[in-house]
């Protein structure tokens, strides 16, 4: 079975100057190519901001922007074509569609796909019905697709009519997509997985009067992650419990968060340690008591699953991608979106739990994290693709 993946976000090799280098979709494809009857080809329609064109011009590398680039990573072949990042439905959108269509047709001519997967399908509604006729086409909705479809409602009709079926990336995204009325919407959720590894937790979590409770945040230091809510909550709870927060990551809001910890007079309890390797992050998770990231606009957030696999009492946000995987009070905790008060109340709730209940939740989190591992999630997704292709009479 030949699987053609369309996406504006994919792992990049050989073009280090390109910023949007993400592995989320590659975490599926790299397992699929190990199947004896499966070939995978990716068309990466990379969105390049205008400021990058000026950078390339200054370096004398503007020619690269206009030249498609082929590379291979972990056995997956990728055809990268750069298009300008412009507002949706801009008058230049049709010109971009021509570039995208040509890239798909050039690859499909020799690859001859049995099925097409479009991650971020709003980027392809202008071309998908004009390429590879009579081949099953699957749309996979991310939160970006939801936001654009809510603003440009005609996209709902396009996704529902130009693709054979639409999958989503989380339970909350599925529920929001149902509200839009997408005709071909499936209940199948394309869950991501974490690299399978043993938990780094060396001892059970147990709160005591003598030892501080160790909180951990891992992520970009940007506004929508709401690390400020955590720092403010610590400021309010500092007389109730000795809390220590380790912050892993970098970002434009770092100085603001540091200043906030000083404002609440807890700068000695908040450590900003920058970026870590995955192994170092796992060790930090194994040592932490509570992992907390009350972010919004989060399709899933693999870091939650990694924290759960390492036994952390994990705090996510209701209505976001992790909602439905975390069951509040059973294998983790959920706060209300955009609510500082909810963060405070949830931390208070956790800190007042008896140690036997804490250990039960930690164990349940570990089991959930291990269940959502990369190989199993990739196999689950591939089996659903095979089923659809067979239903359409194709080669699977």
Regions found by a protein language model. Name each.
Residues 296:
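Aromatic "clamp/platform" in nucleotide-sugar-dependent glycosyltransferases that forms part
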Residues 172, 193:
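Carbohydrate-associated surface elements
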Residues 313-316, 326:
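Short hydrophobic beta-strand element within catalytic cores of glycosyltransferases
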Residues 275-276, 283-288:
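Short alpha-helical donor nucleotide-sugar binding micro-motif in glycosyltransferases
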Residues 4, 206-225, 231-234, 246:
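Conserved donor-binding/catalytic core segment of Leloir-type glycosyltransferases
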Residues 1-65, 393:
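N-terminal subdomain of nucleotide-sugar transferases
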Residues 328-329, 333-340, 349-355:
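Conserved acidic donor-binding segment of nucleotide-sugar-dependent glycosyltransferases
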Residues 258-276:
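Nucleotide-activated donor-binding/catalytic signature segment of Leloir-type glycosyltransferases, i.e.
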């Amino acid at each position: 079975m030949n699987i053609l993946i369309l996406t504006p976000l994919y792992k990049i090799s050989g073009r280090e100057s390109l910023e949007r280098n993400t592995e989320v979709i590659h975490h599926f494809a790299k397992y699929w190519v190990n199947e004896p009857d499966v070939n995978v080809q990716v068309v990466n329609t990379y969105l390049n901001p205008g400021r990058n064109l000026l950078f390339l011009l200054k370096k004398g590398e503007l020619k690269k922007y206009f030249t498609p680039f082929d590379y291979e990573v972990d056995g997956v072949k990728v055809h990268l074509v750069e298009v300008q990042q412009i507002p949706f439905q801009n008058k230049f959108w049709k010109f971009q569609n021509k570039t995208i269509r040509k890239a798909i047709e050039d690859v499909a001519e020799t690859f001859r796909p049995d099925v097409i997967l479009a991650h971020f399908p709003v980027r392809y509604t202008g071309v998908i019905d004009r390429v590879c006729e009579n081949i099953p086409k699957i749309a996979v909705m991310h939160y970006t697709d939801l936001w654009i479809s809510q603003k440009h409602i005609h996209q709902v009709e396009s996704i529902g009519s130009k693709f054979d079926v639409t999958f989503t990336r989380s339970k909350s995204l599925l529920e929001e997509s149902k509200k839009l009325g997408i005709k071909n919407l499936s209940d199948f959720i394309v869950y991501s997985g974490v690299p399978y590894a043993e938990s780094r937790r060396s001892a059970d979590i147990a709160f005591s009067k003598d030892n501080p409770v160790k909180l951990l945040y891992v992520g970009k230091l940007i506004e929508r992650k709401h690390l400020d809510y955590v720092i403010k909550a610590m400021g309010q709870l500092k007389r109730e419990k000795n809390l220590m927060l380790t912050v892993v990551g970098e970002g434009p809001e770092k100085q603001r968060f540091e200043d906030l910890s000083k404002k609440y007079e807890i700068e000695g309890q908040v450590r900003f340690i920058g970026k870590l390797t995955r192994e170092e992050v796992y060790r930090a998770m194994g040592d932490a008591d509570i992992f907390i990231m009350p972010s919004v606009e989060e399709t899933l957030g693999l870091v939650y699953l990694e924290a759960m696999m390492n036994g952390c009492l994990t705090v996510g946000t209701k209505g976001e991608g992790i909602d439905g995987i975390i069951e509040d009070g059973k294998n983790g905790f959920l706060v209300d979106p955009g609510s500082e008060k909810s963060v405070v109340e949830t931390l208070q709730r956790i800190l007042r739990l008896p140690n036997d209940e804490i250990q039960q939740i930690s164990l349940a989190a570990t089991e959930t994290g291990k269940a959502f591992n990369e190989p199993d999630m990739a196999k689950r997704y591939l089996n659903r693709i095979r089923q659809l292709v067979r239903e359409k009479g194709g080669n699977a």
